[in-house]
Amino acid sequence: MNTVDYLRISLIDRCNFRCQYCMPEGAEIDYILKQDLLTDNELLSLLKEVFIPVGFTRFRLTGGEPLLRPNVIGLIEAIASFPETKDLSMTTNGFLLSKMAKDLYKAGLRRINISLDTLDSDTFNLIIGNKNRSHWQLVWNGIQAAYEVGFDPLKINVVIIPGVNDHEVLDLAALTINRNWHIRFIEFMPIGNDKLFDNKGWISSEELRQIIRKKWGLTESFVPGNGPADIFQIPGAKGTLGFISQMSECFCDRCNRMRLSADGWLRPCLLNEIGQIDLKSSLRNGISVEELRQQVEYLLGLKPEINFKQRESGTTGIYSRTMSQIGG
């Protein structure tokens, strides 16, 4: 089992998109009330006094859409300023990125992942649940802005959904040929979207690799990061292709992370809901940070068993939260 030193932090559960695989249409989303979110001070206190002392040094800010969080720049500055912080990154839908890229970089953010599942504006609107003016160009502009500012590596997350965007695999992969971008194909997961998943199913990473390999060939490669992606490269390309295969290829033995939701629940495994700790309520009820630290240490010890023994029940069970509420 890997050393667990990577914490994914959901700053907010709200998002200005409603992507099919994250916040499915028709699903009732009970948004967290403002007073139930971890405050800036609570989050920073947990990081400084609980997570860093037990070995967490790498942090990723997620959502919902993290750029909707008030004072997100200030939070980034504070987390980046911790001497123990080795890596600070973010996953965003890119909608606000063209306006904020420079400030994010200046605050100390150095790596960024941007979600873009299609190069077609109509398909984009379908995926994000948008019935008004297309936002595709704004996201594309955000990607360009992040690249120009200097985020490196710049990664683009792609979820392939059968019958929706699976015809674009080669076009998306081709973005890496002349650009130092890193496209990551993520297998579609049944978390909070059972109806869509049952209707559409999913495409394995190996199937995607075969499509790309037939066109250009593929060689193994490497790109810095904390994730479980298997990295490949089109021969001669500037960028790389990553494949995250949580459905088809168990990588529990490589898991190095936990997830902290916007309302303070610490989740040891994405694939099931066993072992979660409500850190926010404990903190507000006067439980000392020393005791919380002990609880997190204990959960770290249980994580291998949770990962492996509960994997099957997790991928077939009922989830009480959508991906947006978990933090991805």
From Swiss-Prot:
SUPFAM superfamilies: Radical SAM enzymes (SSF102114). [4Fe-4S] cluster 1 binds at residues 15, 19, 22. SMART domains: Elp3 (SM00729). Disulfide bonds: none annotated. Pathway: Cofactor biosynthesis; molybdopterin biosynthesis. The keyword Metal-binding applies. Its cofactor is [4Fe-4S] cluster. GO terms for molecular function: 4 iron, 4 sulfur cluster binding; cyclic pyranopterin monophosphate synthase activity; GTP 3',8'-cyclase activity; GTP binding; metal ion binding; S-adenosyl-L-methionine binding. S-adenosyl-L-methionine binds at residues 21, 64, 115, 189. Keywords: 4Fe-4S, GTP-binding, Iron, Iron-sulfur, Lyase, Metal-binding, Molybdenum cofactor biosynthesis, Nucleotide-binding, S-adenosyl-L-methionine. GO terms for biological process: Mo-molybdopterin cofactor biosynthetic process. Residues 1-229 form the Radical SAM core domain. Pfam families: Fer4_12, Mob_synth_C, Radical_SAM. It comes from the Bacteria. Belongs to the radical SAM superfamily. MoaA family. PANTHER family: MOLYBDENUM COFACTOR BIOSYNTHESIS PROTEIN 1, MOLYBDOPTERIN COFACTOR SYNTHESIS PROTEIN A. This is GTP 3',8-cyclase. It comes from Trichodesmium erythraeum (strain IMS101).
